[in-house]
């Protein structure tokens, strides 16, 4: 297991441009800090006033499209600092406000025992955009995201259910999915059931890729490759976070096609 100093050294490696070998980076800047300070009180008010049920036994507020930012990412007068993020501006959806409380995860009626064990033991590791549908939870590409950006909105201990990533997993996922789609016309890729190949590729990720814990810090952003396997660690005993819980705003703008999604 990585020690705290090893984690810090690894995180510092990713304060520059996204390394294609690992698939993620962390950046910081005054504009990111200003954006988080502007978004935080808005997010807190939304979460505390919301009637949306908390999942995972009352420990996770999903908060999809909860933040009322504009299409440029501006919120409460604060502009999204595209230059600090190192990204080209694109039209944005309302940000997700994901909030986790102490005790995460807990069993719930909406989740099977197997799904809960996977959440507890494997951080509910997943690939965004590959959505499970129907009673049999078969997966296809529904939301081909361009990239994923997460920005911490409040102070939280490193053990307060941090983001976790599997370095290099985007390459394994891309190779596996492309192999499954090789003989399918590109226009039909979004309709293909990719459940089995996805699960096989994810199993390989667990065996071959390094799991890295990425605690959120106000004033910093984490940029993930769209195909990177990632998840949320269980809340560590004794970890603390400001109310209403460890809070992160996420942007995942959608691309034009599945073929584009599977490009480099």
Residue ranges and their predicted role:
Residues 22-24, 146, 246-248:
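Short hydrophobic/aromatic beta-strand or adjacent loop that forms the aromatic wall/cage
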Residues 1-35:
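Fe(II)/2-oxoglutarate
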Residues 210-223:
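Short acidic-glycine-tyrosine-enriched beta hairpin
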Residues 17-20, 34-211, 235:
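Non-heme Fe(II) oxygenase catalytic core, chiefly the N-lobe of the double-stranded beta-helix
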Residues 1, 152, 251-255:
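Short, Φ-rich (hydrophobic/aromatic) sequence segments
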Residues 178, 223-264:
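Non-heme Fe(II)/2-oxoglutarate
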